[in-house]
Amino acid sequence: VCCGYKLCHPC
């Protein structure tokens, strides 16, 4: 899952 600014990590 991608969230934040151009960062992909578990939300």
From Swiss-Prot:
<dbReference type="GO" id="GO:0090729">
    <property type="term" value="F:toxin activity"/>
</dbReference>
<feature type="disulfide bond">
    <location>
        <begin position="2"/>
        <end position="11"/>
    </location>
</feature>
<keyword id="KW-0379">Hydroxylation</keyword>
<protein>
    <recommendedName>
        <fullName>Chi-conotoxin CMrVIA</fullName>
    </recommendedName>
</protein>
<keyword id="KW-1015">Disulfide bond</keyword>
<feature type="modified residue" description="4-hydroxyproline">
    <location>
        <position position="10"/>
    </location>
</feature>
<comment type="similarity">
    <text>Belongs to the conotoxin T superfamily.</text>
</comment>
<feature type="disulfide bond">
    <location>
        <begin position="3"/>
        <end position="8"/>
    </location>
</feature>
<comment type="function">
    <text>Chi-conotoxins inhibit the neuronal noradrenaline transporter (NET/SLC6A2).</text>
</comment>
<keyword id="KW-0528">Neurotoxin</keyword>
<keyword id="KW-0964">Secreted</keyword>
<dbReference type="GO" id="GO:0005576">
    <property type="term" value="C:extracellular region"/>
</dbReference>
<keyword id="KW-0800">Toxin</keyword>
